């Protein structure tokens, strides 16, 4: 801000000059005093000049509706929405979200730092304020091949970018707790830059949590219980209450939120797909859930706004107060939270559920060409097992956590696994797509329920190799080949024919289409997965499959290097 701009702001605030816009007759949510005040909001040059008695030529009568600060999602992966940053902005802003803190570690695992560059540039084309975090753990583990390896040395330049707010969720909590040199060097990169560090510490407690928090890792979104939440708050951390498309802890953790500790609580979605946004909303849905759970509505709005701003050092937003960004949400009530209008930097961006700006998309060519699959053939899907029993990946309710089970299997005369009709054990394979290694790891999956054909994805956390499940090797190979041909996404095959697909040309992770198109495609994919291929009715076919390669979530998962026991932190044999 220059001298003239500051003088004008002060003059408007004092009433000597006319604002650009006045929102009249609003019930203004005062997040500092946890109250509602009646007044007009004066806006000039994208900033709030004051709350009080103002007038100008350009006035909007709020008619007694509630004006709240713009909502801030404190942790989200844009890639998991399956749409581009520009499109996610179009979907989120009408629900009152004006800022998101995004961790692009999915695309970084595929494209490396050029993936971060793409996300930064694409995000500039949306009115939504996207604050990028620098991915901290690429790859997430050394037990798989990813498209990049970002070490501390490579982090030193991007951590200084104005567009990079801090260091993304630090999933390598064992490395922090045990003081591993390479891990400590990454933490120091952020500390030297004076930027915050986002956390990820599921199940960590006691002295281990002390060790993790001592590195001044400031947040955690992985709490499963109120006790874990309270322990983290006691260690000086902020706790993110999550309500997304895949994982939820909001209702559970709200039971532990009090007027005393609520200012250490923030909202996040983590992963949020178009269907969820279009049917339920975003942080406005968090607020409705808070109302259902009996949480004071002003306290809930603090968690959606000022708490996140203070946690991440965003001193220019989070409240309706003089000198702050004019990011304002007008809504009908503090319980129903139906968003009517949204301003970002004083400009009306959404009105009655409609995103107003024209969408201009960034070029995606830098994110394409990420399928380097060497010598793949149906023969690589054969699975010889020398014992009549095998370790299988058993899907538990929720579709993310698995258990290690031993089951009797069907084999042919060459000791190769054969799918038995009526037996809920099928082949699952991970095909390496980044480094031309030719790796194809095959294992067994239980609880998915597929009875015909195959499903292949290029979204497979966290390294995003190709993952495929099926009852027939030929169909599995057909699905993999079709997936490569369409530059990634989702493919369903039955009888060597593609019965449904969704191309995702942005790194094999995101569609270049609108959210409504993605929702319709996913609805069709889910329907055909259940009705044509026979996937169990209680299994979300895409989300469940994409987590079967995530080697940091117990108990066993499959990477391109083999069957991995997360508890033992080592590979195990299929034979039991």
From Swiss-Prot:
Cross-referenced Pfam families: Adenine_deam_C, Amidohydro_1
GO molecular function: adenine deaminase activity
Reaction(s) catalysed (UniProt annotation): adenine + H2O + H(+) = hypoxanthine + NH4(+)
This protein's UniProt keywords: Hydrolase, Manganese
Positions of transmembrane segments: none
Entry's family note: Belongs to the metallo-dependent hydrolases superfamily. Adenine deaminase family.
EC class: hydrolase
Protein name: Adenine deaminase 2
SUPFAM superfamilies registered for this protein in UniProt: Composite domain of metallo-dependent hydrolases, Metallo-dependent hydrolases
The protein's required cofactors: Mn(2+)
GO biological process assignments: adenine catabolic process
EC number from the UniProt entry: 3.5.4.2
Lineage: superkingdom: Bacteria
InterPro entries: Adenine_deam, Adenine_deam_C, Amidohydro-rel, Metal-dep_hydrolase_composite, Metal_Hydrolase
């Amino acid at each position: 801000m220059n001298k003239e701009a500051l003088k004008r702001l002060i003059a408007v605030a004092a009433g000597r000059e006319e604002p650009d816009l006045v929102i009249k007759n609003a019930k203004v949510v005062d997040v500092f005093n946890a109250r509602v005040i009646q007044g007009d909001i004066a806006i000039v040059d994208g900033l709030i000049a004051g709350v009080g008695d103002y007038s100008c030529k350009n006035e909007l009568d709020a008619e007694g509706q509630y004006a709240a600060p713009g909502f801030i999602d404190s942790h989200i992966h844009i890639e998991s929405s399956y749409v581009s940053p520009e499109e996610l902005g179009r979907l989120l802003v009408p629900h009152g979200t004006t800022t998101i803190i995004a961790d692009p570690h999915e695309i970084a695992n595929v494209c490396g730092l050029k993936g971060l560059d793409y996300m930064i540039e694409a995000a500039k084309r949306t009115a939504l304020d996207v604050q990028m975090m620098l991915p901290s753990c690429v790859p997430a583990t050394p037990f798989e091949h990813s498209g990049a390896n970002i070490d501390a040395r490579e982090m030193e330049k991007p951590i200084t970018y104005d567009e990079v707010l801090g260091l993304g969720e630090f999933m390598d909590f064992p490395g922090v707790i045990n003081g591993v040199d390479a891990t400590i060097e990454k933490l120091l990169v952020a500390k030297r830059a004076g930027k915050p560090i986002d956390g990820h510490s599921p199940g960590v407690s006691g002295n281990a949590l002390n060790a993790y928090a001592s590195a001044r890792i400031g947040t955690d979104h992985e709490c499963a219980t109120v006790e874990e939440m309270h322990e983290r708050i006691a260690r000086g951390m902020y706790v993110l209450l999550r309500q997304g498309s895949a994982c939820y802890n909001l209702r559970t953790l709200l039971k532990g939120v009090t007027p005393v500790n609520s200012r250490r609580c923030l909202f996040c979605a983590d992963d949020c797909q178009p269907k969820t946004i279009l049917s339920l909303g975003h942080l406005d849905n968090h607020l409705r859930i808070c109302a259902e759970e009996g949480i004071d509505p002003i306290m809930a709005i603090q968690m959606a706004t000022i708490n996140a701003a203070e946690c991440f050092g965003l001193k220019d937003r989070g409240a309706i107060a003089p000198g702050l960004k004019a990011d304002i949400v007008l809504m009908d009530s503090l319980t129903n939270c139906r968003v009517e209008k949204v301003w970002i930097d004083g400009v009306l961006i959404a009105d009655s559920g409609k995103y107003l700006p024209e969408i201009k998309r960034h070029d995606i060519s830098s994110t394409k060409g990420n399928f380097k699959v060497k010598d793949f053939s149906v023969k690589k899907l054969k699975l010889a097992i020398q014992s009549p029993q095998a370790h299988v990946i058993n899907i538990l309710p929720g579709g993310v956590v698995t258990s290690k089970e031993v089951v009797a299997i069907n084999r042919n005369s060459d000791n190769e696994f054969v799918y038995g009709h009526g037996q809920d054990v099928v082949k699952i394979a991970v095909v390496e797509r980044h480094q031309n290694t030719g790796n194809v790891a095959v294992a067994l999956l239980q609880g998915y329920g597929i009875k015909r054909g195959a499903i292949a994805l290029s979204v497979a956390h966290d390294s995003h190799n190709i993952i495929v499940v099926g009852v027939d090797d030929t169909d599995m190979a057909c699905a993999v080949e079709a997936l490569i041909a369409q530059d990634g996404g989702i493919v369903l095959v039955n009888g060597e024919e593609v019965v449904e697909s969704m191309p995702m040309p942005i790194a094999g992770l995101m569609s270049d289409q609108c959210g409504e198109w993605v929702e319709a495609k996913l609805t069709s994919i889910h329907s055909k997965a259940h009705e044509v291929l026979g996937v169990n009715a209680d299994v979300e076919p895409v989300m469940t499959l994409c987590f079967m390669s995530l080697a940091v979530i117990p108990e066993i998962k499959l990477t391109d290097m083999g069957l991995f026991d997360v508890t033992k932190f080592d590979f195990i044999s299929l034979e039991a």
